[in-house]
Amino acid sequence: MLEDLIKEFKEIFKYDGEVETFFSPGRVNLIGEHTDYNGGFVFPCALDFGTYAVVKKREDKVFRMYSKNFKNLGTIEFNLDNLVYNKKDNWANYPKGVVKTFLDENYKIDSGFDVLFYGNIPNGAGLSSSASIEVLTAVILKDLFKLDVDMVEMVKMCQVAENKFIGVNSGIMDQFAVGMGKKDHAILLDCNTLKFEYVPVKLKNMSIVIANTNKKRGLADSKYNERRSSCEEAVKVLNDNGINIKYLGELTVAEFDKVKHFITDEEQLKRATHAVSENERAKVAVEFLKKDDIAEFGRLMNQSHISLRDDYEVTGVELDSLVEAAWEEEGTVGSRMTGAGFGGCTVSIVENDHVENFIKNVGKKYKEKTGLRATFYIANIGDGARRYVK
């Protein structure tokens, strides 16, 4: 595949010399959903599919970007001296925002580059195609311009690019998982301190199955930002009543139960209840995983989905239909929505002997209920973003 991408790069950019190649994964979060911007714990892993780039540094200040995923948009061109968000640049605003953020942080980037991107992460699936291209761009910049910057710093800058340049208030989880991923491990990340731990994911006779609802959705215009402000309002209410916290993630369920009566707005209370309980669930689930108790880990995945459905209200009929069909299947250890919600994907742990039936039966029930056709992927846990050497 890489040879084909290099060949296509050379045709599009009329160039026949040496090129650089890079890869950046997608990610899936196993548990700990909508906790990242609440200063809590998440448990994502990088996937073995993602975004590839073929790159050639230029002598001038021009960037020319082409994506095989958006061929109809052709080559998108912009200049180092004019890095502003432009709606018609569409997907290229993501890499552009990363370049701008590096410059704002005083990293020396003195020329542009030509790049061909190709991603095999389904767009809008909630598997972080945007974080993947952001971190990929950061790795390209570091390599081409020999920048002295570590991955955690790059991850933070990519989050800034998404928040400030694109205008989506995402937490740090996506970029962190994409940049810091490690084969066969998930990352227990404290989003408040960025302390993290690699935890081996040893599923023995089971697999991680990702199911895509194939429902069209956009993160920026979804109700994501509303959920976030609900939680911030709840924190404000608690602070006004003498509970001194910056994030809901600082409270255990027991501590929250003692003070939740201060939150009189019913919707805020539900949102805060999810943030606190999900954070505790994530920590407990990882302890079970370390003890090889996959059954308990799966049970907590199920509870996570119920909380996201009832308290956080970010699931919707498509995700619920997929998860409920999964729960009915023999061999399902756990199943929940993953990512921001309102469409996107579910993640399930399924016994290998039952995977084939799982895909067939869940797909059939989902189509009967929603009229949509789900796409299924068996996920392998891969490494983070890097220069790609065959």
Predicted stretch roles:
Residues 1-22, 28-32, 40-41, 79-80, ...:
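Gly/Ser-rich oxyanion-binding loop with an adjacent helix/lid
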Residues 1-27, 52-88, 185-334, 349-390:
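C-terminal nucleotide
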Residues 32-34, 46-47:
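N-terminal cofactor/phosphate-binding cores enriched in small/glycine residues
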Residues 39-46, 227-228:
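Short Gly/aromatic-enriched secondary-structure transition segments
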Residues 131-132, 345-349:
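FabD-like malonyl-/acyl-CoA
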Residues 342:
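Glycine-rich phosphate-binding loop
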